């Protein structure tokens, strides 16, 4: 009889404890539900007429993706993917014109007039040279949503050489991903204060970046190599190697407020691009030959063609076989063209 009594007490105690716990859990659940409903009601009231919009949502184009900074009238970041195949094509930039991006509200867009006589060039973040795959893809790189005010010498020189290096990486890697954009970094004053100061151009107050960044992620088989670079928006001579401007990815993320390639396992996968590859940009002679080749291709008269070759010789540079053959082919083309009106 005593055993039966003990079992009954234990059963009842367990039942009461379990029931009590269940009631407590139910009360907690109902409280949380009520709290959530109350918060939702408050949130709905706050959101009644909408919340502020930054316009920083991801925008997709044929061959690049970007996020736009409406307050500064420049991109926050521009992302691309390069491969040997995707760099092929016949699109020509002579058919493209800089213009406001139709996807950007008129109130927040930059205009060509902002750059006119400003002392700054219109610098591509996704370069036209990466987009020969189609006329439309190249034309979209001329939208001002992909453009920042850039120092002329930097745009035509160091930054151009960096873009060429990125394209050349597709000869050694199967896939190359790029993220490029502007930075506004502080300068240290004499009194030790760190001050962010930057110029605005045009009636639309387009922000002139103090620096530009480019993050390169290259893949070959299972190898992933990354390099992050921060470049002053100023002239940079041929004596400065690219590695002078290499920074850690975490430092760039701190400067920019962006997280790059979040799906990559950095601890396990990433190698230093400049250790896996050369990070070697074209030197003066190589770059001059490259630019001369572009001028030869675009020459429309024999006089212009000969001027290109004369300038090259005056610089003390001997044309390589590629440029010599390109010159002879272009010369034959222009001679035939000048003969036609006489026939």
Regions found by a protein language model. Give the residues of each.
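Domain-level detector for secreted/extracellular nuclease and nuclease-toxin modules, and
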Residues: 2-343
């Amino acid at each position: 009889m005593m055993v039966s009594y003990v079992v009954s007490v234990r059963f009842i105690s367990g039942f009461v404890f379990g029931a009590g716990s269940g009631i407590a859990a139910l009360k907690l659940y109902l409280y949380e539900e009520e709290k959530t409903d109350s918060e939702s009601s408050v949130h709905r009231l706050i959101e009644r007429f909408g919340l502020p919009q930054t316009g920083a949502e991801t925008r997709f184009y044929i061959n690049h993706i970007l996020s736009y900074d409406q307050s500064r009238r420049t991109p926050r970041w521009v992302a691309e993917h390069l491969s040997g195949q995707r760099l092929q094509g016949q699109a020509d930039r002579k058919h493209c014109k800089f213009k406001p991006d139709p996807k950007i509200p008129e109130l927040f867009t930059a205009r060509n007039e902002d750059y006119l006589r400003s002392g700054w060039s219109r610098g591509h973040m996704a370069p036209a040279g990466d987009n020969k795959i189609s006329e439309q893809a190249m034309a979209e790189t001329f939208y001002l949503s992909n453009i920042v005010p850039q120092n002329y010498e930097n745009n035509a020189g160091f930054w151009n050489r960096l873009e060429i290096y990125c394209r050349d990486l597709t000869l050694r890697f199967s896939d190359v991903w790029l993220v490029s954009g502007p930075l506004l970094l502080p300068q240290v004053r004499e009194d030790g204060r760190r001050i962010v100061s930057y110029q605005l151009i045009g009636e639309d107050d387009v922000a002139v970046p103090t620096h530009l960044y480019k993050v390169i992620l290259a893949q070959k088989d299972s190898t992933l190599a990354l390099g992050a670079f921060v470049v002053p928006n100023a002239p940079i001579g041929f004596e400065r190697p690219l590695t002078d401007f290499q920074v850690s990815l975490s430092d760039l993320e701190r400067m920019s407020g962006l997280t790059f390639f979040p799906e990559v396992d950095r601890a396990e996968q990433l190698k230093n691009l400049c250790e896996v590859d050369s990070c070697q940009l074209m030197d003066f002679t190589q770059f001059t030959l490259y630019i001369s080749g572009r001028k030869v291709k675009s020459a429309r008269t024999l006089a212009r063609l000969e001027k290109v070759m004369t300038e090259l010789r005056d610089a003390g540079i001997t044309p390589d076989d590629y440029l010599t053959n390109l010159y002879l082919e272009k010369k034959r083309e222009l001679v035939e063209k000048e003969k036609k009106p006489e026939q």
